[in-house]
UniProtKB/Swiss-Prot annotation:
InterPro entries the UniProt entry points to: Ribosomal_bS21 (IPR001911), Ribosomal_bS21_CS (IPR018278), Ribosomal_bS21_sf (IPR038380)
Gene: rpsU
Source organism (scientific name): Verminephrobacter eiseniae (strain EF01-2)
UniProt protein name: Small ribosomal subunit protein bS21
Family: Belongs to the bacterial ribosomal protein bS21 family.
Entry keyword set: Ribonucleoprotein, Ribosomal protein
Pfam family for this entry, one: Ribosomal_S21
Source organism phylogeny: Bacteria, Pseudomonadati, Pseudomonadota, Betaproteobacteria, Burkholderiales
Length: 70
């Protein structure tokens, strides 16, 4: 369970922002969304494989030299 201590004279907005940032760092929302519905193991493997391919091509594209514009 994630908790934050609200400091004295701290606005609610700031405390809420700190809480959201903590939740984001822990990855709780992404984990919760992933577990919201059952995903078959084959579908999960397929999704992860597609994400890995996408990351690979993105890395390759970033390493290429830019085309010269004449």
């Amino acid at each position: 369970m994630t908790t934050i201590r609200v400091k004295e004279n701290e606005p609610f907005d700031v405390a809420l922002r700190r809480f959201k940032r903590t939740i984001e760092k822990l990855g709780l929302l992404t984990d919760l969304r992933a577990r919201e519905f059952y995903e078959k193991p084959t579908a999960e493997r397929k999704r992860k494989k597609a994400a890995a391919v996408k990351r690979h091509y993105k890395r390759v594209r970033s390493m290429q030299l830019p085309k010269k514009m004449y």
